[in-house]
Amino acid sequence: MLSREIIEKTEVFLKRKFDAADYLNAHPEAKAYRIEHTYRVANIGRELALKEGFDETEMVIACLLHDVSYCEEFGEKGWIEHGRRAAHIARPFLSELGLAEDRINDICYGIAIHVDEKADFPGERTPFALSVGAADNIDRFDVFRIHETLTHDGFSSMGIDQKLEYCKKHLARLHKLIDEPMGTKTADEMWKARLSFQISFYEKLVRQFESRGLTRSMSKKGCSPDN
């Protein structure tokens, strides 16, 4: 059962950290994105917890705090270290909540390894710990991320040939990633479903662009595509 009181305390802690962050305050769009991403990951984590039998509250806490280190200025290695930094920031707060030490360590270990699967303290790669990173990864491939990625990469301003090459590169990457293990059966299923959707999307784009290329070729030869 979800403890609303503990979740609310975690939200207050996270908000306080983000509100005090110079970088996030100077870049409101980055702050809004980080908050939205955090809550999406928390919702995915809760779904994983319900289906895999994890403690809902602990999983939601872990997901809410997985990127809390964005309250700090990132140095040269800031991004690669942000999981480990988040774990260190979260640990004292989790102790204040009165959680058992073994549960604190499991939560912190999951947070620490969610970027590059490495921690700077002892821990186990339990299904619970792995699910923090799984929830984060699953969110990276939701439907809206397609729009965000295409917009960020300037897809609309590309020519047809560039778009075709772009889509093929994305397809190659998606096919490579789809069999990556996510730590639990539920996470594996969610991961494959999301990547399969994106694969279908990009395959349709490829067919459309290849069809346009064929149409242009026929036009140059004086043919009509209706013939």
What are these regions (language model features)?
Residues 3-24, 37:
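Short alpha-helical hairpin
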Residues 96-101, 151:
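Inter-helical turn/loop segments and adjacent helix faces that build the functional surface
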Residues 1-5, 27-54, 65, 118-227:
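Divalent metal-dependent phosphate-bond-processing catalytic cores, especially two-metal-ion Mg2+/Mn2+ enzymes
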Residues 6-13, 54-63:
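Short coil-to-beta-strand
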Residues 23-28, 71-72:
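A short, mixed-charge helix-start or loop-turn motif at secondary-structure junctions
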Residues 56-78, 82, 86, 107-117:
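His-Asp-centered metal-binding catalytic motifs of divalent-metal-dependent phosphohydrolases/nucleases
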Residues 41, 81-96:
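An active-site-proximal "capping" alpha-helix that borders the catalytic cofactor pocket
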